[in-house]
Amino acid sequence: MLNLFQHPFLRSNAVVKQPCVYILTSQPYGTLYIGVTSDLVARVYQHRTGEVPGFTSRYGIVSLVRFDLLETMPEAIAREKQIKHWHRQWKINLIESENPQWIDLAVGIGLPSLPLQP
């Protein structure tokens, strides 16, 4: 995994080694991916670059639309499992409760914006 301090787009306000649950999407109302990490910047960077082959790279799931910071990794894992068991509409409601426009939040944590899709 890319170390946060080696990250080429690091900004001083980036989230540093904090357990969190995050939701990525391919596009607004598109395919959703729920994950957990202790290094959000590095993990989202990996998803965006396709560094790790799998579900997100196969379906172009690269836009960060929600993340929740938690105190401990066990709490983050429990929250991830909880959200993964929710109905799709509940997940959409969760995203829209704080991000109704489905804006890519990755820019706010230090990553460059995604190129515009045609």
Annotate each predicted stretch with a short phrase.
Residues M1-P53, S57-L69, P74-K81, E98-P100, ...:
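GIY-YIG nuclease catalytic motif and its immediate N-terminal context
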Residues R58, K81-L94:
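Short arginine-rich
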